[in-house]
Each structure stands twice: as structure tokens, then as C-alpha cells.
């Protein structure tokens, strides 16, 4: 029988107190390949010491789907948080429009990384009277693409 003040019990409790926070605070990383709920594919390169990153985006949805090409993205994230907030801009190569995304990188209870985002897309219009219809708003959830080894 183990007495309540046993050194073994104290050692066990101390070990659990030190290890448990690390188990629940898995860091979410933006770097890698992601796909969203619509089938778009995004690749984010390494995040530098300032939190800056670049990458590419291939949308699965467009007004002219036959013209879709890989488009560059440029962004920044907060580096200190385990589940960082971020923002990036996509310069669409196949249309006169630009999109900005803001979001947060989460690790869910099962350990899966998820990017929850909101976006604005600005379309080019020929006249200021059409400004009212030039900005679209939406949201996308991205999940990390599995690699062959997984």
C-alpha cells in the first residue's frame, strides 16, 4: 500500500504536472500543403523569423474555371502562439482580382491541424457605380494534406 505522502507518489504527481501541458499544447504550423472544403490547394513555404511566408494557391472555384492557374500568395503570422493568427494575400494570375485571408491555425482534439479563415475578394470593375458588387466575402476551412508516409 502506498502512503499519501510517499516519495514515489510525489514523484509521479510532479512528472504528470510537468508532462501534461506539453501533451495538450501541440504547435500548429502553417508550412506545408493544405486543401479546403471546396477543393482548393494551398502550399505555404517556410515561415521566417519575422513571421513572413510565401506560397501558392490553386483555387477550385472561379468565374472562368478554364482559366485557373497557380497564383502567388504572401503572408505573415504571429510566431509566439501555439495556435497562431495569420493573414495572407493572393494575387490571382488569371483574373483582375485580389483576395485577402485572415485566420487562425488550430490543433483539434484529435491532433489534426485546421486553418479557420475568413476572406475578402476584390474584383476589378470598370466604373465606380459598380463598386457595390465588387467585393465578395466568405470563409474556408483548410486541412493539411496527408503525405505518402502518413
Swiss-Prot record:
Biotin binds at residues 36, 40, 57, 59, 63, 95, 99, 140. Its main location: secreted. Residues 26-147 form the Avidin-like domain. Glycans are attached at residues 54, 67, 93. It is found in: Secreted. Forms a strong non-covalent specific complex with biotin. Belongs to the avidin/streptavidin family. This is Avidin-related protein 1. It comes from Gallus gallus. The gene is AVR1.
Amino acid at each position: 500500500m502506498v502512503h499519501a505522502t510517499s516519495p514515489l507518489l510525489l514523484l509521479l504527481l510532479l512528472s504528470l504536472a510537468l508532462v501534461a501541458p506539453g501533451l495538450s499544447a501541440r504547435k500548429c504550423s502553417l508550412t506545408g500543403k493544405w486543401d479546403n472544403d471546396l477543393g482548393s490547394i494551398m502550399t505555404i513555404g517556410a515561415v521566417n523569423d519575422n513571421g513572413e511566408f510565401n506560397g501558392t494557391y490553386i483555387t477550385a472555384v472561379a468565374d472562368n474555371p478554364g482559366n485557373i492557374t497557380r497564383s502567388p500568395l504572401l503572408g505573415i503570422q504571429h510566431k509566439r502562439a501555439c495556435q497562431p493568427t495569420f493573414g495572407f494575400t493572393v494575387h490571382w494570375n488569371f483574373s483582375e482580382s485580389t483576395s485577402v485571408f485572415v485566420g487562425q491555425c488550430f490543433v483539434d482534439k484529435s491532433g489534426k491541424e485546421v486553418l479557420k479563415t475568413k476572406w475578402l475578394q476584390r474584383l476589378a470593375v470598370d466604373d465606380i457605380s459598380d463598386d457595390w458588387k465588387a467585393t465578395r466575402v466568405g470563409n474556408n476551412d483548410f486541412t493539411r494534406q496527408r503525405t505518402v508516409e502518413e
